[in-house]
């Protein structure tokens, strides 16, 4: 595995040498993944990770976050945050969300951004491992309403690389922004390309 990219001081850290070693070991175990690109220097970010076609994507993402010693959060249905896995999910960065909540998921996550000094939220724009006709727009609305950038991270199974790409502010039109995002993600090879 190549050297890790430089980590800007503004990014929230876990401060865990053991976690970093575990993350590096997991990246090697999962097929010798490397981390490429330049990490963004923002303390609040929506990280859009794609293409998402396999359960392994989650484990590569968690391993990379641990290896980089970054405190990256992710969303999970509130009903999975129960004993015996609740403590593990929370310690890995899970944020329980209730889809039936009057604020909706977007409102709950925007409130989380507003209450946090720093928050890196990683999620999949596809919203599913299956092939989808269109990406969900929730991540875009979260970034727009919370006034935080969207940073693109690609999973390239052809080269076993997790690639930090460009960051952008949510513009006036989701469809226009999506075109820009897809131009980056089309350079990546999914684990199951037929589902990308």
Task: Locate each region found by the language model.
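Acidic/glycine-enriched edge-of-secondary-structure segments
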Residues: 12-24, 89-101
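A generic structural signal for alpha->beta connector loops
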Residues: 32, 69-71, 91-93, 118, ...
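A general structural signal for well-ordered alpha-helical segments in protein cores
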Residues: 23, 58-61, 106, 178
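Catalytic core of membrane glycerolipid acyltransferases/transacylases, capturing the structured
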Residues: 38-100, 157
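Helix-to-loop junction immediately C-terminal to a conserved catalytic motif
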Residues: 15-52
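Residue-level preference for nonpolar/small residues embedded in alpha-helices
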Residues: 18-20, 57, 81, 134-135
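Non-catalytic C-terminal accessory region of glycerolipid acyltransferases
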Residues: 2-18, 29, 102-196
């Amino acid at each position: 595995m190549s050297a890790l990219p430089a980590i800007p001081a503004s990014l929230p850290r876990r401060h865990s040498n053991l976690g970093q070693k575990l993350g590096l070991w997991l990246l090697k175990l999962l097929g010798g993944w490397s981390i490429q690109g330049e990490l963004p220097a923002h303390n609040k970010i929506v990280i859009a990770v794609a293409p998402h076609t396999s359960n392994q994507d989650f484990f590569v993402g968690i391993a990379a976050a641990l290896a980089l010693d970054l405190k990256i959060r992710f969303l999970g249905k509130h009903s999975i945050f129960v004993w015996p896995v609740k403590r593990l999910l929370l310690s890995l960065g899970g944020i329980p969300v209730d889809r039936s909540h009057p604020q909706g998921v977007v409102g709950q996550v925007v409130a989380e951004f507003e209450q946090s000094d720093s928050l890196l939220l990683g999620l999949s724009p596809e919203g599913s491992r299956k092939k989808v006709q269109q990406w969900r727009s929730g991540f875009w609305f979260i970034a727009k309403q919370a006034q935080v950038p969207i940073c693109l991270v690609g999973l390239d199974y052809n080269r076993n690389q997790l690639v930090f790409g460009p960051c952008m502010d949510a513009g006036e039109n989701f469809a226009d922004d999506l075109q820009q995002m897809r131009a980056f993600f089309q350079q990546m090879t999914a684990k199951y390309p037929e589902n990308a």
